[in-house]
């Protein structure tokens, strides 16, 4: 006599009739239905999450980083990085000159309409008002950062020089300089600087600093030149920094002390 399988019905004696257990096929059907229900619920959750994410949209980054490779046929390449704050219409250029461990931070602040220079090795900031060309440079920096690609200047990069006269007697109130300038120059004196156009006299780089520049420990450079017009007065060059822009223009910004 063969043993009864799990699918065979086993009648139980009783006056009211015969009761049977569910077959194996029934259990399989119930298990498949439960598995199918779980898969459907998981799929609904994925779709709902995708719809919610698309409704909110991807978060727009406030800061974009633009890294620049700067070829120079005459000197080693500086390390330069540009951090652009699109929401605040501002860009901070960090430049580390060749063979130096000290960086410069140059802030283009579109909200306050100023450019701030902060040499790391000196406890001082230089502030000047933006001109139309500076606003165009800031717009170019913001637009270039949106591409999110490294920018490499072409071989026909134009090099120029900019002289800024530092007015040591005019210290800027940080409360009037704007939030970004305050953050960059925290607990650091800020002095007004202006372009040297209209200034005059010889430019000398080999001389001992005097006044507040001497207190900063600034060392004069071996630079000689001449400003074209006006009364002839000696000018001492103390600090210079080279900055390159996506417009294929590299500028050597030099500061000199304007006597009181």
Swiss-Prot record:
S-S bonds: 125-185
Keyword Transferase among record annotations: no
Membrane-spanning residues: 32-52, 236-256
Family annotation (Pfam families): BRICHOS
Coiled coil: none
Residues glycosylated per entry: 79
Principal localisation: membrane
Entry superkingdom: Eukaryota
Protein name as annotated: BRICHOS domain-containing protein 5
Source organism per UniProt: Homo sapiens (Human)
